[in-house]
Amino acid sequence: RGLGDVYKRQTKNFHDMELKELALERAKTWLSDQYDEQTRQQVQQMIDQDSDELVDAFYKDLEFGTGGMRGIMGVGTNRMNRYTIGAATQGLADYLKEQFPGKPISVVIGCDVRHNSDTFSRMCAEVLSANGIKAYLFDGFRPTPEISFAIRYLHAQSGIIITASHNPPKYNGYKAYWDDGSQVVPPHDTGIIDRVAKVHVGDIRFTPDEQLIETIGPEVDRAFVEAAVEHGSC
């Protein structure tokens, strides 16, 4: 092996050290009182163990892109959890209030059967309601087409689907929909992305207004089936 191989190894080691230091500094911010006790304990344990998991969980932010976001569930800035989902929903709420100033806003929320999908859905409803936005929350798991239908049926301005499609079980995801029942497209996609990027943990409104959270289910189920039959989809 020549000097080139030695240089490559040294460069990689240096890069790995930089990532580790970056991840450690970012992880330490999650030990503040802005995060719940269980999260702080999990982060401290990761720091104490000095594991590769710490680097992967904190070296970057979980990206919210045109297709929403998708990632491994767990604590960290690069994971699906209460705070990354909270930030995404707060950003969506901020954007909706910009787009529909002074008007009543509602959002339909549904999920698939993945681990934590129902918990994450509830989190979305709580953040939206805390922002004065009505949340229509399905009473259980539903297929994506029905959630898309419900957005139009209930005349909502947006929708959220908690799903990671074909990814392995440790993943989950977050997809934003617009009032036409389809995933957000320009200019709304970039508008939401920009708003989400500006959200800090202290900006997230977690305290729900239960009066703005409405459970939906059988009525929408029936309307969905009837519409599918009427239009020849069944």
What is the predicted role of each segment?
Residues 1-7:
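Short, small-residue-biased leader/transition segments that mark boundaries at the very start
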Residues 14-87, 195-202:
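Cofactor-/ligand-binding subdomain signature composed of acidic, glycine-rich
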Residues 19, 30-31, 102-179:
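Ferredoxin-reductase
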Residues 30, 34, 53-58, 62, ...:
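Gly/Ser/Thr-enriched, mixed-charge loops and adjacent short helices
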Residues 63-79, 103-108, 126-130, 199-219, ...:
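Gly-rich Lys/Arg/Thr-decorated short loops/hinges at beta-loop-alpha junctions or inter-strand turns
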Residues 80-90, 116-117, 139, 143, ...:
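Phosphate/oxyanion-binding active-site loops and adjacent basic polyanion-contact surfaces
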